[in-house]
């Protein structure tokens, strides 16, 4: 009764909120599809971000393909032109260098994505010359020019010091010096530059064969000479009918490769044929800056402090041996203890130690191969090892890369150096061969000494070719993350810029090199280089951070590609 008489509350009870019905459709409901509702706020944010990023990447990739296809179609007519069986396509030499503080893979990816498709569509032959250490491009260009000068002087070529051992290089230099002395003495000797003759000559000079044709019987010598002359005439006839295209070209990808290429031109035409530094300076290790891992870590402040190595086992054994020699009474106790364990070899070793000092290093090295002994012992090459001696778990000996030779001439010495006498004649022969072949490609001279026939030699001599500079902008650093993200979503602009520059190198005109403006091509890329890397380069005298010094005499006949109908290059 008390409950019935209790006064009711005047406040109304809160009713439950009605459930959202969402989108209902009888047809969907008949198919068993649940009610469709809008996602929650958090899911809306998530899908918006994912959709925006995915859409941006897809749109940029789609536009990039369109731009690439546009430039491929612009040069496709060159690839569709019929090529004769004896016609050699035009060759382009591409120089690539890793970006500062990073690896070579980035610039190679840049080449394969934006440059290679256009060269392939134009059916051009191209050779990529890449460097892993600073200075290699400069040395390759300079050494190519020096070998050309040696060839014009009648001297043998010297192999690249990056590809041969120091002994082989010194041997080649000695042979060249001997040839110079022979020419000075006025003696004449028949030298055949034919590769086939040189190959057969190397076979005849093998161990067990006569060292020279003079030591052969007269019949064998006559047969050898007749066969050589016939092979030489055949090669000459085939070469005379080949349709070489002397209109080659050079592409420098990035500011660093361009600076090294210009330095190589000056070193080759103005520098001496041989390294002016003494031999002891050449044997010193050249600083591999900046594209070695240790230099990258140093430039980025990631170098770890060296940790002191623990005492080696040999030093421990030596200290024990000295202690036993100074306390003979301990040897007897140790011998008795070991004799109870049955180790007779250990007793003998201890007794020998008590008798006198033992060469612990040699004995330990023979049984345990300690680090101290293995460092002093030169490892035997795998080719000289027998199957029983070879240990597959043993570490291979470290292969040290040959150092990059330093420049033969410094930039401040350009003005005082004398230009090579073969500079003007080389460019004139190259231009004459190009004009003759372009005017009548089907008419080939029979005489290889004529200017047009000499164009065959200029296919490999890229340093006479016009230059095209293609940008490669690469930025690093955490503070540059917003700029890196913006560039990532705008790679279509890179494809447009690089594609236009590549098409200019394939189909564009040429103009003389401008010593006032052209040295600053792609100078804006230097602002993207890491500041720590640049500072270290300035301290170590890096070639990349030095200002570009050009000589009017060297760049007088050098050409630069430009778009057709334009007076100035836009690649700045």
UniProtKB/Swiss-Prot annotation:
The chain crosses the membrane at residues 43-59. The keyword Transport applies. Residues 60-572 are mitochondrial intermembrane. Residues 192-205, 212-221, 363-376 have a biased composition (Polar residues). The keyword Ribosomal protein does not apply. Residues 1-42 are mitochondrial matrix. It is a single-pass membrane protein. Keywords: Membrane, Mitochondrion, Mitochondrion inner membrane, Protein transport, Translocation, Transmembrane, Transmembrane helix, Transport. Residues 1-21, 185-221, 363-404 are annotated as: Disordered. Essential component of the TIM22 complex, a complex that mediates the import and insertion of multi-pass transmembrane proteins into the mitochondrial inner membrane. The TIM22 complex forms a twin-pore translocase that uses the membrane potential as external driving force. Component of the TIM22 complex, whose core is composed of TIM22 and TIM54, associated with the 70 kDa heterohexamer composed of TIM9 and TIM10 (or TIM8 and TIM13). This is Mitochondrial import inner membrane translocase subunit TIM54. It comes from Yarrowia lipolytica (strain CLIB 122 / E 150). The gene is TIM54.
């Amino acid at each position: 009764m008390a409950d019935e008489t209790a006064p009711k509350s005047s406040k109304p009870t809160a009713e439950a909120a009605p459930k959202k019905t969402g989108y209902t459709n009888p047809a969907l409901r008949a198919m068993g599809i649940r009610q469709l509702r809008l996602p929650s706020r958090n899911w809306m944010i998530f899908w918006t971000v994912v959709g925006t990023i995915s859409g941006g990447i897809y749109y940029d990739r789609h536009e990039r393909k369109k731009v690439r296809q546009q430039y491929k179609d612009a040069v496709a007519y060159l690839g569709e032109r019929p090529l004769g069986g004896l016609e050699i396509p035009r060759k382009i030499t591409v120089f690539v260098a890793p970006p500062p503080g990073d690896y070579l893979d980035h610039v190679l990816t840049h080449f394969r994505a934006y440059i290679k498709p256009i060269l392939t569509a134009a059916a051009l032959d191209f050779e990529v010359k890449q460097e892993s250490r600073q200075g290699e491009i400069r040395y390759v260009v300079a050494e190519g020019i020096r070998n050309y000068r040696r060839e014009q002087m009648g001297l043998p070529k010297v192999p690249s010091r990056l590809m041969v051992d120091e002994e082989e290089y010194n041997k080649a230099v000695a042979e060249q010096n001997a040839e110079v002395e022979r020419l000075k003495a006025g003696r004449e000797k028949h030298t055949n530059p034919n590769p086939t003759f040189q190959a057969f000559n190397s076979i005849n000079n093998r161990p067990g064969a006569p060292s020279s044709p003079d030591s052969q019987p007269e019949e064998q010598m006559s047969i050898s000479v007749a066969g050589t002359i016939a092979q030489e005439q055949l090669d000459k006839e085939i070469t005379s009918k080949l349709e070489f295209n002397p209109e080659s070209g050079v592409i420098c990808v990035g500011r660093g490769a361009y600076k090294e290429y210009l330095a190589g031109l000056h070193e080759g035409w103005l520098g001496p044929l041989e390294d002016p530094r003494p031999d002891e300076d050449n044997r010193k290790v050249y600083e591999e800056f900046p594209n070695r891992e240790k230099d990258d870590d140093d430039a980025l402040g990631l170098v770890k402090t060296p940790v002191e190595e623990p005492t080696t086992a040999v030093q421990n054994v030596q200290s024990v041996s000295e202690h036993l020699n100074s306390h003979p009474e301990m040897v007897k106790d140790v011998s008795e203890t070991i004799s109870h364990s049955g180790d007779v070899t250990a007793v003998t070793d201890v007794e020998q130690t008590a008798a006198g000092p033992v060469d612990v290093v040699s004995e330990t090295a023979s049984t345990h191969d300690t680090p101290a002994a293995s460092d002093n012992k030169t490892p035997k090459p795998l080719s000289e090892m027998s199957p029983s001696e070879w240990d597959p778990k043993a570490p291979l000996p470290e292969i040290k890369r040959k150092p990059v030779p330093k420049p033969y001439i410094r930039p401040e010495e350009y003005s005082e150096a004398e230009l090579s006498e073969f500079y003007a004649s080389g460019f004139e022969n190259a231009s004459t061969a190009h004009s003759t072949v372009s005017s009548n490609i089907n008419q080939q001279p029979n005489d290889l000494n004529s200017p047009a026939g000499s164009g065959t030699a200029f296919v490999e001599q890229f340093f006479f070719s016009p230059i095209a500079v293609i940008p490669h902008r690469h930025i690093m650093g955490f503070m540059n993350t917003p700029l890196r993200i913006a560039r990532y979503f705008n790679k279509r602009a890179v494809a447009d810029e690089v594609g236009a520059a590549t098409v200019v190198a394939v189909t564009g005109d040429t103009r003389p090199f401008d010593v006032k403006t052209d040295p600053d091509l792609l100078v804006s890329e230097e602002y993207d280089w890491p500041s720590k890397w640049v500072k270290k380069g300035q301290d170590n005298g890096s070639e990349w951070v030095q200002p570009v010094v050009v000589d009017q005499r060297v760049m007088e006949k050098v050409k630069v590609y430009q778009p057709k109908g334009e007076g100035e290059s836009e690649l700045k």
